[in-house]
Amino acid sequence: MSFKKSAEISWFAPICDGDDDFLGNRNPLYKSSWENTCKIVQTADKLGFKNVLCPSSFQVGQDSLSFVAAMTNQTKDINFLPAIRCGEIHPPMLARTIATIDHMVKGRLTLNIISSNLPGENLESKKRYERSKEVIQILKLFWSKDFVEYEGEYYSFKLPSDPAKPYQINGGPLLYLS
């Protein structure tokens, strides 16, 4: 019996500037910009890469969700993996934004959930992961219910959610946690 081995290769969209500091002298050609990053992602798409990670930074660089939305008509096959820092965007708005983008890319969307501190915060790890857990619960509720009533430690609201449903009918985009 033989097993076929396969590997899924992803690419990195340098939408956050400054990640190349550790490479030595910074090359101005690699500075984060819409034009440069768009070309990189289009090339990765043409070369058959499966995914592209779109990182998030609250200090410098482009916004990952805005970048992915803008790239929808610039690519054909590549799956987008934007990093989402929990707590940065109000969860009902985040659910609606993600559902909209998921329709724009026709399901070529996976989410990288980040549980880091926000600017000026110094929450212990446990609290950050609890907040992320609430955000994930809220996203799932907004993607599956027409009205959401939620009471948690970090968020509390009663809001309609229709029609903020993702393109992917299996409960929304796949989530990676980091």
Where are these regions (language model features)?
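N-terminal beta1-alpha1-beta2 module of alpha/beta enzyme domains
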Residues: M1-N79, Y167-L175
